[in-house]
Amino acid sequence: MSNEAKCPFNHTAGSGTSNRDWWPKQLRVDLLAQHSSKSNPMGEDFDYAEAFKSLDLAAVKADLAKVMTDSQDWWPADFGHYGPLFVRMAWHSAGTYRIGDGRGGAGRGQQRFAPLNSWPDNVNLDKARRLLWPVKQKYGNKISWADLLILTGNVALETMGFKTFGFAGGRADVWEPDLDVYWGTESTWLGGDDRYGKGKGSSSQGEIPADAHRHGQEQARTAPAGRNLENPLAAVQMGLIYVNPEGPEGNPDPLAAAHDIRETFARMAMDDEETVALIAGGHTFGKTHGAGDAKHVGREPEGEDMDSQGLGWKSSFGSGVGGDTISSGLEVTWTQTPAQWSNYFFENLFKYEWELTKSPAGAHQWVAKGADAVIPHAHGGAPLLPTMLTTDLSLRFDPAYEKISRRFLEHPEQFADAFARAWFKLTHRDLGPRSRYLGPEVPAEELIWQDPLPQAEGAQIDAADVAALKAKVLGSGLSVPELVATAWASASTFRGGDMRGGANGARIRLAPQKDWAANQPAQLAKVLKTLEGIQSAFNQGGKKVSLADLIVLAGSAAVEKAAQDAGVAVAVPFRAGRVDASQEQTDAASFAPLEPIVDGFRNFQKQRYAVRGEDMLIDKAQQLTLSAPEMTVLVGGLRVLGNNVGGSTKGMFTDRVGVLSNDFFVNLLDMATEWKSTSPAQEEFEGRDRKTGAVKWAGTRVDLVFGSNAVLRALAEVYASADAKEKFVKDFVAAWVKVMELDRFDLK
């Protein structure tokens, strides 16, 4: 008998058949417990922003500059410079961002973890991060991996002769993979059938349907048949950052590839000019790697053996490194100076006619007809012919891209400026507003995609002012539901993925938010008109209150009144300091994806979707950075406060709407009530008296899940208990204030 067989332990913690094995559609309440203090080795007192402020950024950059040309035998630098590798590393760290849901991106250093550390498109970037370890080790916790990856990309560009637009730190690391990001449902790497619905543009598995976001809608209307990419995905195949460089599904058609490029880059919030600049700028440097057949390449890092120590993609082709490297399978070097900024990309793109060929690994690529061998070999071999990818040729043959490309060819200074700005946007898009930017290289120029805010002016309102304003609001004739709904609508646009949205700026009074269906435009206009009157009268006295502050203050006053009416005296904490943005500071197209097409906290769905309402509630709660208890108490409180959209009474399990009671939980869990579905899809339900059969309540999946899901029921029972009256109010107020202050980075 082997030693293994003699082991007295035949199980370990977490092994065996899991709950999700038995019930694959089980609600993922666990998504609300990510990145807790239990996974963070730094402790609750660690303040990354303060640590970063003590960093000598110039010294870090000097050390990074040395790394660029310090070629290591275990992974030799192409052209004697690691710059191109680090540009790709930084790009792929940031390039997972998508504007549709604000997830992905560079902000948490997720490239270190699965699945990103093992994506086919990230092949051999494990080596790039290992090259950086001595620098990370030296500066320790003063610079996060998330910041270091982006800073290294900037230093790479600068050491290759390019002037960058700037750099901002502030990306705090997390210590485990993000579990909430929807990357698609394909079960094979580089699969794309599900996201294109096998030719039908299906959206049944995503968070939202394919027509839910307006960003890039024009391109979607002209998509080739069956080429409608599921939202919010921004990559054409599982494990790619954007597009297949060989062309759609390997078809080397530059025009077809242009559609995929335009759609995926638009979903990362890039327009045509930014797209051209990024592709051409990135491909000014370095090369792709396809020295031999991919069969020589081993497993990705997550699938490798322990002695590989987190490295993957070992190659048995030749030396496996240097000139024998296999990464993408393509073997393309774009310019005559791959480690130096130039305009050679556009010069070569338009100078030559291009002939389809294949790389040594068998991948489709293009070679210049009749050209001289002017391209240097990465490791000292004979010069090479100019080569391009199918997606590079898209910049010449797509009419819109071609116009921009020719302008950049003729005006290199415009190209350099466009690339600098697009690179900064790419690497900072998910960092949030400028108030989160740290370090001496933050650019002074304010950019529209940063959702700019004006500076606060004058003294902030004090406690006496707050009390006076609350009295004015409560005496204005506006109801508790109206005030609560307006404050919630203003604050709950916040997305933890990219730190956008929230109450600061009072953009709820501007396009597009003032017209969103979830915000009940007619009611909203009425409330805002009344609040603006109160604001105007108050501001006559010398001190100023912003409408952004007043909206939140009014909602908080309503919560206090509702609690008092329930017999609980409570003061809702309020901190002034919000400002009012202008329409000129608000890019309506950029804000369109923030529209709540579903909001379980308001029992609102703009239309019926294939995704279950309770799953979308979890999604919304996760964006609001809520825990499961916070989500639970907010739903229960907002229902009895009348926060539903359009006069719906579903889920309002109370006969005293506007009173902050625990009635929602008490009545939901009442065994005298029997619930039955009233729709074939089990979307809506009636609660009937078990004895008389009389209808008592009506609810939706988002309501009944707090009784049907075991985890949520356990939480609901806490708030339904006889001794929970004060705890319920206290917990609701804490969660309410959290949401109201999610975008108050000036307080954190």
From Swiss-Prot:
Gene coding for it: katG
PANTHER family referenced in this protein's UniProt entry, alphabetically: CATALASE-PEROXIDASE, HYDROPEROXIDASE I, BIFUNCTIONAL CATALASE-PEROXIDASE
HAMAP family listed in its UniProt record: Catal_peroxid (MF_01961)
Domain of life: Bacteria
The protein's role, per its UniProt record: Bifunctional enzyme with both catalase and broad-spectrum peroxidase activity.
Positions of the record's site feature: Transition state stabilizer: R88
Biased composition, class Basic and acidic residues, residue ranges: 290-301
Gene3D superfamilies: 1.10.520.10, Peroxidase, domain 2
Coiled coil regions, renumbered to chain: none
Native source species: Herbaspirillum seropedicae (strain SmR1)
Annotated catalysed reactions: H2O2 + AH2 = A + 2 H2O; 2 H2O2 = O2 + 2 H2O
Disordered: region residues: 194-223, 288-310
GO molecular function, one term: metal ion binding
Record-given protein name: Catalase-peroxidase
Cofactors: heme b
Subunit structure: Homodimer or homotetramer.
EC identifiers of the protein: 1.11.1.21
SUPFAM superfamilies according to UniProt: Heme-dependent peroxidases
Entry's cofactor comment: Binds 1 heme b (iron(II)-protoporphyrin IX) group per dimer.
